Amino acid sequence: MAGPVEPGLDHADSPNVRVVKDTFDALSEGGLEAAIEHLLSHSHDDVEFAPYVGAGQVLRGADEVRAFYRGQTESGTVLTARPSTIEECGDEVFVNGSLRVLRPTGGFAESQISWTYRFRDGRLQEARGGPRRAA
């Protein structure tokens, strides 16, 4: 089991950790659409997403994932995610960090959350956002 990895440290990253780090980089550099497209390019066709902002909704397949996040963007919602720790255990990559949701009305919420990325055969099978995991 690998221990925590500081975001931005590139030594000894597994391919799965690299996909996750590159997704957060794409979000900060190119926006939400770029991050989603990067992650989907490394996903199985039947990938499942359970976004933190999805109120329990489970998205299945790239089309549902794209439609959900396109709807967020088109509504004027801005999502900013910042990883603080990344840990790998087998085929799972766990990220603790913060998510800021800025609503078109001007209201916002910032939460400390965790993301879990489950890989199968080197491709993403499942991504979930939820309450922060203990470190």
Segments (PLM) and residue ranges:
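Short beta-strand edge/turn micro-motifs at domain boundaries
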Residues: 2, 112-135
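Hydrophobic pocket/interface hotspot
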Residues: 20, 35-39, 47, 61, ...
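Short beta-strand segments enriched in hydrophobic/aromatic residues
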Residues: 43, 99-101, 115, 130-131
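Short, cysteine-centered beta-strand-loop-beta hairpins and adjacent loop/turn segments enriched
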Residues: 74-77, 101-110
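Short, low-complexity N-terminal intrinsically disordered segments enriched in polar/charged residues
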Residues: 1-41
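Short, surface-exposed coil-to-beta transition loops
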Residues: 79-82, 96, 108-115
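A short hydrophobic beta-strand element
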Residues: 88-99
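A solvent-exposed, acidic/Ser-Thr-rich amphipathic alpha-helical stretch
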Residues: 36-89
